[in-house]
Amino acid sequence: MMRILFASFFLLPWISSLHAQPLFYQGKTITLIAGTTAGSQYDAHARLIAQHWGKHIPGNPDIIVQNMAGAGSLIAANHLYNLAKPDGLTITSIIPAIYFNQLAGRKEVRFDYPKFNWIGSVDRSDNVIYIRSDTPFKTIYDVRRATQGPKCTATGTGTIGHYMPKLLNETIGTKFDIILG
């Protein structure tokens, strides 16, 4: 009992200064920028988040989705970094491989990826490169030793289909021939 009284004596001055903080998000709207076209995977993620997330944020803000497609989410990432106010009211759902744009030194990159604050992920993607069994390439070492590497395709330079073989070519010396389109 004496310990409780002793602890209370020292804690009382601080307890009186504790009061409810105003709810920052109350009455506000969060804009969730989807870095892809309407109907795409990341647009669907953004709309699912917008539908439910506001209920779990103190102040229960409204959340709207704004599509800002183009350049594999590069337009959305550049917008968030350079134009959106850093007030916690604009967030984005972009293609996770966006950081490869900066690593590759693309001149269109207008952001510093490590300065983005990651909130969370809707899913996890594992990347796999596979090759037909009737080719001479049975292991990654075969691709490294090849005089002419296997062809692999990607829809564009901002995609994981481009960056994964490019990263392997530059880091471990594979010889993937990347065809875009």
Language-model-derived ranges and their functions:
Residues I15-A20:
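Sec/Tat signal peptide C-region and signal peptidase I cleavage site
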